[in-house]
């Protein structure tokens, strides 16, 4: 199950506009204080480190440190838009195949060496190594890269691919310090003593914590040239609950990745804010339309299912309401969201009316609707994780109320991915999906993706949607691309091969002693550090 711009739950999310960000606590950046340099910020994190190399980073700690220490040619800003980072500028030619990046002249590694095109070539070469199978494996597949000068690099794609800019957010590695191939990368001392280009650098690592110190020549903070905090300490805990206990005792300043059940406890802590950061992680019910015998072959049945499910209640059961109801492939805060598409408001009465009108009625009076001798029943396959299982049971209850019999088939997550999803061994599949910051629905709805390793779990495709999805991938202009997406969203909303249910939030608790944190959507947990160079603990009186 792969996709060019995603990680698997499947993993890599549509672009989010910040104007609608929902937070339990608001930004604290507007308080009447001015930031001052100094101070140590301590955050509790679940897990322990294996490698800080961004290509090898696997644990929560690895990924957090990697985000603080390294940077890429581009990055996502607060609103989810791709902007230049290590690059000063970038452009794409009219064909959509040739992308050219100019590296900013003031970008340096922590050892003072300049960032050059050689670093880009080296990093891309590692990601293109056949032995590498990590989350960035698809980012540069089939892409050729060349250095036009020490500061200019050019990527040539086999075909136009509008979301390619998102691939260039991949953190760069220093070619002057690492000359080994991918197979030897894991044995390098560099992995726990990395040299990067980010606002902080690793100072010390022990069994209890990793300490990072400020880089005094960080290009993105110029003209002040450095972050406000002196140090960031990431302290290791067994799990999120233990880290939350440390926050309650005042041992750390923040912790994240909290469960909805933790939210109530956070509210009892004095001087602590709870932030609910939107993500593009959505949960959906894919309806398998492949079999000619499937009840899902009838579009009215699919529309009735979408109408009968109380998404708000499903969200409450699965995530204590921490998130938002989903209506389409991207959230309402995305540039790709289209308001003018068919939506299915929860209504048991309307769902019953749809089924009655299509002659799906209880002819044999056994409590289950049927038509032509076929009972309206199916099984939902999902993971045995409590939140997902709770969602499945709530859906089953909603559908039972309109005369549809639903069984819940819960299996371990590994089995769900490797056997059930990949082999398409299900009637309906309830899963969580993460898509790239620049949305690409192609892997989920194109005819070429109906079998593994594609992600078209429903088996849905039409000639029209195929052409639209192909054209959207080739269209760099965002406005034109949105128009193409609008047609795709309308087709999916009408045909209902999948019922979008809800988006989840990332819960982050932080002491009010820290200032400068700004609420933003997070594509992944480390993205909470998106403006860490502006965080501060010390203040001076405003003049």
Question: Can you say where each PLM-predicted feature lies in the sequence?
Answer:
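Detector for C-terminal structural segments
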Residues: 8, 16-20, 33, 209, ...
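Surface-exposed binding/hinge segments that line
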Residues: 8, 102, 136-180, 203-204
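N-terminal lobe/hinge region of extracytoplasmic solute-binding protein
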Residues: 44-94, 125, 195
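Aromatic- and charge-enriched surface segment that lines or borders ligand/interaction sites
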Residues: 88-133, 148, 154-156, 246, ...
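Extracellular/periplasmic solute-recognition and catalytic clefts
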Residues: 127, 144-146, 203-213, 235-293, ...
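Gly/Pro-rich hinge or "lid" segments in bacterial periplasmic/extracellular proteins
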Residues: 170-227, 231, 241, 348-353, ...
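Ligand-site clamp/hinge motif
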Residues: 188, 218-265, 280, 384, ...
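Structural transition elements
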Residues: 200, 325-363, 382-390
């Amino acid at each position: 199950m792969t996709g060019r711009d995603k990680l698997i739950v499947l993993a890599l999310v549509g672009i989010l506009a910040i104007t609608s960000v929902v937070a339990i606590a608001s930004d604290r950046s507007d308080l009447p204080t001015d930031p001052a340099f100094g101070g140590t910020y301590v955050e509790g994190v679940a897990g322990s480190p294996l490698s800080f190399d961004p290509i090898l980073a696997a644990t929560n700690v690895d990924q957090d440190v990697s985000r603080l220490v390294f940077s890429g040619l581009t990055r996502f800003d607060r609103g989810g838009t791709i902007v230049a980072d290590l690059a000063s500028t970038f452009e794409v030619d009219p064909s959509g195949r040739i992308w050219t990046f100019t590296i900013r002249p003031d970008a340096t590694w922590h050892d003072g060496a300049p960032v050059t095109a050689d670093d880009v070539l080296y990093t891309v070469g590692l990601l293109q190594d056949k032995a590498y199978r990590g989350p960035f494996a698809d980012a540069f597949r089939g892409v050729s890269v060349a250095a036009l000068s020490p500061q200019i690099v050019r990527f040539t794609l086999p075909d136009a691919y509008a979301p390619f800019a998102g691939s260039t957010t991949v953190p760069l590695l220093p070619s002057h310090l690492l000359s080994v191939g991918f197979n030897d990368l894991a044995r390098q001392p560099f992995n726990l003593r990395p040299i990067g280009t980010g606002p902080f650098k690793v100072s010390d690592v022990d069994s209890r914590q990793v300490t990072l110190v400020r880089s005094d020549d960080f290009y993105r903070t110029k003209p002040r040239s450095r972050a406000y905090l002196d140090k960031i300490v990431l302290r290791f805990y067994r799990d999120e609950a233990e880290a939350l206990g440390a926050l309650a005792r005042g041992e750390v300043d923040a912790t994240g990745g909290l469960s909805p059940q933790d939210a109530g406890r956070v509210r009892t802590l004095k001087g602590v804010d709870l932030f609910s950061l939107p993500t593009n992680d959505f949960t959906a019910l894919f309806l398998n339309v492949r079999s000619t015998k499937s009840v899902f072959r009838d579009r009215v049945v699919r529309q009735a299912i979408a109408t009968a499910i109380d998404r708000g209640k499903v969200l409450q059961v699965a995530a204590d309401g921490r998130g938002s109801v989903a209506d389409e492939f991207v959230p309402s805060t995305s540039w790709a969201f289209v308001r003018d598409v068919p939506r299915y408001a929860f209504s048991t009465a309307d769902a019953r009316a749809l089924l009655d009108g299509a002659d799906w009625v209880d002819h044999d009076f056994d409590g289950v609707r049927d038509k032509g001798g076929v009972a309206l029943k199916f099984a939902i396959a999902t993971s045995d994780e409590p939140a997902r299982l709770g969602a499945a049971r709530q859906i089953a209850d909603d559908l039972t109320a309109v005369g549809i019999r639903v069984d819940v088939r819960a299996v371990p997550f590994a089995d769900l991915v490797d056997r059930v999803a990949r082999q398409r061994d299900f009637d309906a599949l309830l899963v969580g999906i993460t898509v790239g910051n620049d949305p690409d629905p192609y892997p989920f709805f194109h005819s070429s993706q109906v079998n593994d390793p594609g992600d078209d779990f429903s088996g849905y495709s039409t000639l029209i949607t195929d052409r639209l999805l192909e054209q959207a991938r080739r269209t760099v202009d965002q406005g034109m691309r949105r128009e193409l997406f609008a047609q795709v969203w309308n087709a999916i909303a009408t045909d209902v091969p999948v019922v979008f249910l809800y988006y989840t939030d990332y819960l982050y608790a932080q002491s009010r002693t820290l200032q400068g944190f700004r609420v933003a959507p997070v594509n992944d947990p480390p993205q909470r550090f998106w403006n860490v160079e502006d965080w501060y603990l010390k203040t001076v009186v405003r003049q």
